[in-house]
Amino acid sequence: MPDKFKRVHVVVMDSVGIGEAPDAAKFGDFDVDTFGHIAKHVGGLKMPEMGKLGLSNIREIEGIKKAEKPLAYYTKMQEASNGKDTMTGHWEIMGLYIDTPFRVFPDGFPDDLINQIEEKTGRKVIGNKPASGTEIMAELGEEHVKTGALIVYTSADSVLQIAAHEDVVPLEELYEICEFCRKITLDDPYMLGRIIARPFVGEPGAFVRTPNRHDYALKPFKPTVMDALKDGGKDVIAIGKISDIFDGEGVTESIRTKSNMDGMDQFIAVLDKDFNGMSFLNLVDFDALFGHRRDPQGYADALVDFDGRLVEVMEKLTDDDLLIITADHGNDPTYTGTDHTREFVPLLVYSPRFKNGGSELELRKTFADLGATVADNFDVKMPEYGTSFLRDLK
């Protein structure tokens, strides 16, 4: 068995699927292929760094040459859990199996839930649709200020958000309302991943969000590989929305990010730190800005930008580092609707230690194989699900 790695870096390209999963039809998805359809839409993707790692060796992506000698071990992973959302994907990556999917409400929330909120608060609810926070604030903020009605909205993720002006609904009241919403949406039929308080201030036409946002998430129902690492005295550095996804569980340091490029900046800064454990980065723009908005050109540009930053990442890695690049679900921007798509995700595993490059790994039947590999590397408690591929990395 080769020496273990001192640091493992997991990079999740949020929603960058690599082709329809065998059970996609069960999720209402037919002929979905995030990576493939984006590449086709733009007449080929220019991602030379991902190409060198072996992206097109997993399956050919237009514009990206197959590597004769891929630098990374490569395959794709199939999601086992019964869902295609961010929390399900990430929780499975870290060793959990999710039987009941988190619910999404692309047409707004049912009357029953809205009625409960109105009865409890004595305030009307306006909005009740998927929207970007800044847009709905501009659209309904003035009505909210005049009437005191709550702006309730969602996104393509499993989330209920409540926006309110701090002079109209005091923070304490807004937080109490969100706590009530959290309580009543823990189980079916709602099963929401997250409730978010979104306070704002200002005048019509110039409303701005304040830093007093508060998230009411669900904690993972069992310990994950992150908990095992933390309990084993290892570092778990969460970059981007990772800490939110796990509600802070198993995290030793959390670094917020403003965008994909800021995420890469923060990640590259973390690579300069001396630590023993895992860094875990989520790059959300692929999903939030381009997948849900069905913008294949914007998505393609973001992929090219990401590829361009990999040069800096590779320069910082030593033989003590293992880099794992993957995704958490698909979100084909050429598909109908605005929802995620049920897809395989890419898996690229690289270390400068691999002097002869990588080769194909077996197809992974669960994302949890990734978490199992991390646990195996650090000799901490193995997750219930997942099989380590550490021994296949020569």
Swiss-Prot record:
The keyword Isomerase applies. Mn(2+) 1 binds at D14, D328, H329. It catalyses: 2-deoxy-alpha-D-ribose 1-phosphate = 2-deoxy-D-ribose 5-phosphate; alpha-D-ribose 1-phosphate = D-ribose 5-phosphate. Pfam families: Metalloenzyme. Its cofactor is Mn(2+). The keyword Metal-binding applies. Its main location: cytoplasm. InterPro entries: Alkaline_phosphatase_core_sf, DeoB, Metalloenzyme, Phosphopentomutase_DeoB_cap_sf. GO terms for molecular function: magnesium ion binding; manganese ion binding; phosphopentomutase activity. PANTHER family: PHOSPHOPENTOMUTASE. This is Phosphopentomutase. It comes from Listeria monocytogenes serovar 1/2a (strain ATCC BAA-679 / EGD-e).
